[in-house]
């Protein structure tokens, strides 16, 4: 998997609590190899995400089931809406994510009962399942 934090390349300071330095929106480019997923099935506590599929074929797992997506498709998930993007095609699945970048974001993982809490940025996180655990524990 490959992720490029475009907003950070444009000067976003992810650890800043100053919203003018954080940018109001976060833009990420993602490439997911065939048969892999972007992240475990999860729901954000405060964040909205808009997905724009650039190329490839995928399956979006959500609370109502699964939906196939292809290049040109767009979809959105709001807070407390669990989701996961799985590459169900033979080629890389490439898409953009535009998120609203809230301060104090956390995520819940329904399959494992874990929580991810961002201390100052997504890179500075702790994952809790009764006690701190590995990020992919119980997800694979």
Positions of the model-derived regions?
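Ligand-binding loop in jelly-roll beta-barrel domains
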Residues: 79-105
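Short acidic-glycine-tyrosine-enriched beta hairpin
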Residues: 64-80
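A short, N-terminal "cap"/entry segment at the start of jelly-roll beta-barrel domains
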Residues: 1-24, 34, 110-140
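Conserved short histidine dyad/triad with adjacent acidic residue
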Residues: 10-15, 28-44, 79
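Structural motif
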Residues: 50, 57-59, 66, 82, ...
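Short, conserved beta-strand element in jelly-roll/cupin
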Residues: 29-33, 43-62, 98-102
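Short hydrophobic/aromatic patches on the structural cores and recognition surfaces of FHA
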Residues: 56, 72, 85
């Amino acid at each position: 998997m490959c992720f490029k934090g475009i907003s950070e390349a444009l000067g976003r300071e992810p650890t800043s609590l100053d919203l003018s330095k954080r940018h109001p929106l976060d833009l990420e480019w993602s490439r997911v190899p065939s048969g892999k997923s972007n992240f475990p099935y999860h729901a954000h506590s405060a964040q909205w995400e808009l997905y724009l599929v650039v190329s490839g074929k995928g399956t979006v797992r959500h609370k109502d089931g699964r939906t196939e997506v292809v290049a040109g498709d767009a979809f959105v998930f709001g807070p407390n809406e669990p989701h996961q993007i799985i590459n169900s095609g033979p080629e890389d699945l490439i898409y953009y994510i535009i998120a609203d970048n809230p301060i104090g974001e956390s995520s819940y993982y329904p399959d494992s009962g874990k929580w991810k809490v961002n201390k100052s940025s997504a890179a500075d996180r702790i994952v809790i399942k009764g006690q701190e655990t590995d990020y992919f524990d119980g997800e694979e």
